[in-house]
From Swiss-Prot:
Taxon lineage: Bacteria, Pseudomonadati, Pseudomonadota, Gammaproteobacteria, Enterobacterales
GO molecular function annotations of the record: 4 iron, 4 sulfur cluster binding; electron transfer activity; metal ion binding
Binding site for [4Fe-4S] cluster 1: 12, 15, 18, 147
Assigned keywords, A-Z: 4Fe-4S, Electron transport, Iron, Iron-sulfur, Metal-binding, Repeat, Transport
Obligatory cofactor(s): [4Fe-4S] cluster
Name the UniProt record assigns to this protein: Electron transport protein HydN
Annotated organism of origin: Escherichia coli (strain K12)
Amino acid sequence: MNRFIIADASKCIGCRTCEVACVVSHQENQDCASLTPETFLPRIHVIKGVNISTATVCRQCEDAPCANVCPNGAISRDKGFVHVMQERCIGCKTCVVACPYGAMEVVVRPVIRNSGAGLNVRADKAEANKCDLCNHREDGPACMAACPTHALICVDRNKLEQLSAEKRRRTALMF
């Protein structure tokens, strides 16, 4: 079973610290000072309602719809998470439509391309953007480490069984 992150809405205060930690974690220089509206592209999103806030993030589906519909095979399961190979992504947005959680998005990043005439030109490349569980970090997902209320938890098979057992116990004790 793939691990995934879920948010406890009863603990989330909507501060968006998880979003900032995510973006900084995925930057080369990992510096908050270099963030701009163009580079602020989190892979986790805080949704605020009238009385509740919570974060939405990729569920790392076992039979990932995003991977199943990708025409270039740019999305695959790798080391326990669903991974996007950006060099294969064509930005077609099929994965965005297929994701039942709204956790996949296509973002535009500036790239330098060779024009064929020996000139390098600046262009934009659309690519899929989703949670990768911060696989580049030894300490695990940056969003979880940064959350001041510990509203984010990483769920694996054991944690899922524990959560289910707690819910069954609460349900049984209600009657």
